[in-house]
């Protein structure tokens, strides 16, 4: 019997709530997603995932602590935290878009797009596989309502 490939999923509620065994029955999946968490959680992540391929996604919960003055420091810490997670191979999802306001504002997603660009640039020259699905999740500058449960978390289509 062949061993199943081993994957560890690290990050926030997007990871925690993903029905991994449903979508990836061919893999051994370890779920280290923690709802409400962000950079501090990934910086303090201490599980030994060195025998796994690791999928990481976080950042949505950090957005409202950020502004133009502290984004570069955040990006430095973000990339350092991702690089510190032990793995056979690391896949990093971009920070996903979100819908925070009833007035159909796209401002938060424009800010997330800037953050994603800076993170992606900082990852150049590393072995991290960056999964930029941001624009695929958007509709008119907002998270596509057909892909979300609650204007933040993705559904099965997402």
What residues fall within each predicted segment?
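Charged phosphate-binding loop/patch that engages nucleotide di/tri-phosphates or the phosphate backbone
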Residues: 1, 157-158
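Serine-esterase "nucleophile elbow" of acetyl-processing enzymes
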Residues: 1-53
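Alpha-helical cap/lid subdomain in secreted, periplasmic
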Residues: 24, 43-157
């Amino acid at each position: 019997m062949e061993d199943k490939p081993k994957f560890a999923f690290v990050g926030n509620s997007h990871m925690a709530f993903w029905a991994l065994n449903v979508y990836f029955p061919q893999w051994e999946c370890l779920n280290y997603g923690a709802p409400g968490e962000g950079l501090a959680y990934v910086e303090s992540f201490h599980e030994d995932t060195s025998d796994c391929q690791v999928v990481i996604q976080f950042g949505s919960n950090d957005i409202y602590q950020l502004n133009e003055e502290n984004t570069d420091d955040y990006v430095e810490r973000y990339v350092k935290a991702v690089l510190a997670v032990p793995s056979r191979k690391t896949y990093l999802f971009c920070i996903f878009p979100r819908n925070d306001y009833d007035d159909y504002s796209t401002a938060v997603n424009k800010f997330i797009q800037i953050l994603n660009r800076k993170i992606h640039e900082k990852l150049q020259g590393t072995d991290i596989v960056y999964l930029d699905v941001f624009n695929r999740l958007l509709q008119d500058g907002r998270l596509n309502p057909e892909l979300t449960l609650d204007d933040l978390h993705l559904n099965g289509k997402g």
